[in-house]
Regions:
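N-terminal helix-turn-helix DNA-binding core of bacterial DNA-binding proteins
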Residues: 2-4, 10-37
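Alpha-helical residues within the helix-turn-helix
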Residues: 32, 49-50
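Residue cluster at the C-terminal edge of the helix-turn-helix DNA-binding motif
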Residues: 50-53, 81
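Beta-hairpin "wing" of winged helix-turn-helix
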Residues: 53-67
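Charged, amphipathic alpha-helical coiled-coil/dimerization segments
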Residues: 63-80
Length: 142
């Protein structure tokens, strides 16, 4: 399951992509648009900067911006950076050691298939795909 942190990280990335032509975007502006606490977003952007997905600038005119074009980010890399592995079981995680039951585990093929589906789902979608889907949505009536 993707936590709030992962979902908000994706929203921050989308917000930065939508406002990419405005230069560095102040975190307070993102927080207002996304209706998320600025304090919580500070934790998330720290991870995104550390993972080299976004760049930060302090001072007047400072804020955050994408390091790459929206089409150069996968949803999977954003989610995994903030959530950790997407593997459904520990023995399929990239940093897992050799499982002693690997050769006789009857459920491993099932979990491996599920892991492949999840990985392919997240890594086949790009930030630009989410922007396009958002633009295609009809306006909601109030």
């Amino acid at each position: 399951m993707v936590s709030t942190k992962g979902r908000y990280a994706l929203r921050v990335m989308l917000d930065l992509a939508e406002h990419a032509d405005e230069g560095f975007i102040p975190l307070k502006d993102i927080a207002l648009r996304q209706e998320v606490s600025k304090k919580y977003l500070e934790i998330i952007v720290r991870d995104l900067v550390g993972g080299k997905l976004i760049r930060g600038s302090s001072g007047k005119g400072g804020g955050y911006r994408l390091c790459r074009r929206p089409q150069d980010y996968t949803v999977g890399e954003i989610i995994e950076l903030t959530e950790g592995t997407l593997a459904p079981i520990a023995c399929l995680a990239a940093d897992a050691g050799n499982c002693p039951r690997k050769d006789r585990c009857k459920t491993l093929p099932f979990w491996h298939e599920f892991d492949t589906m999840v990985h392919d789902f997240f890594y086949s979608r790009r930030l630009s795909d989410l922007l396009s889907a958002q633009a295609d949505e009809p306006a909601t009536k109030k």
